[in-house]
Amino acid sequence: SGVIMTKDGYILTNKHVIQNADQIVVALQNGNIYEANLIGSDNLTDLAVLKIKATNLSTIPQNKERQVRVGDIALAIGNPYNLGQSVSQGIISAVGRSAVGDSLGRQNFIQTDASINRGNSGGALINSAGELVGISTLSIGKTANEIAEGLNFAIPISIANDVLYKIIRDGRVIRGYFGVQSEITANSNGGIVITGVTANSPAAKAGIQVGDVILRLNKQDNLSIREMMQIISDTKPNTEVIVTISRLGNVIDLPVIIEELPSN
């Protein structure tokens, strides 16, 4: 499935939907069929941007002022099992889900019990006002030993929009890269404990070590790991940031040159 995002034919879908495709064809509900060009894709969010030669297309309205809340009505629109356009109804079960699926980079999923079956991936998740709130991406289903029901996930439209416009502008999503593994512990005094440093990463080059506690990033303190990741991700490569750490009781400011996140 896919979602028309602009009147001139930019479409969002999931990367896994079009991966390894020799040709991509888009069939609209009105029966019109278009050959689509792949503009770019993003591994971390599993999103891809397509373009068809069309004008005056209808798009789903969005409302940036309305926050997605647990208990909201959710409608998943897509093409499950190639049956044709279908709508399933549920509620928003949770927001801010992370570490879902096979990529640690995918964060902040919307969880819903609206059915997302094979073929729904890349389709629209809308609210009861008909506003686009997410892009349906994956579900946790049956395994050999158990059956999971109602565990379906969508990428929030705010993240999807950001990826869309970056791919339209640059052909890909350019993210900042720091190169550490981290956690927050009870005795880290609100800081973020470094549990691993990737060799030859910006953090390693700046002298950051395992056991250091990050207190501030560019003078911003009390950051969660997710907030720190987002700040780094949004930082342009070759930009210097000041990381304030605690090491063996000493507070140290370390300049770090952010690099571009490697594609792998």
Role assignments for model-derived ranges:
Residues 1-190, 198-199, 225-229, 233-239, ...:
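Serine-dependent protease modules
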Residues 11-12, 203-225:
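Conserved PDZ fold ligand-binding element
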Residues 256:
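Disulfide-stabilized, aromatic/cysteine-rich ligand-recognition loop
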Residues 204-206, 253, 264:
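Extended hydrophobic-aromatic, low-complexity segments
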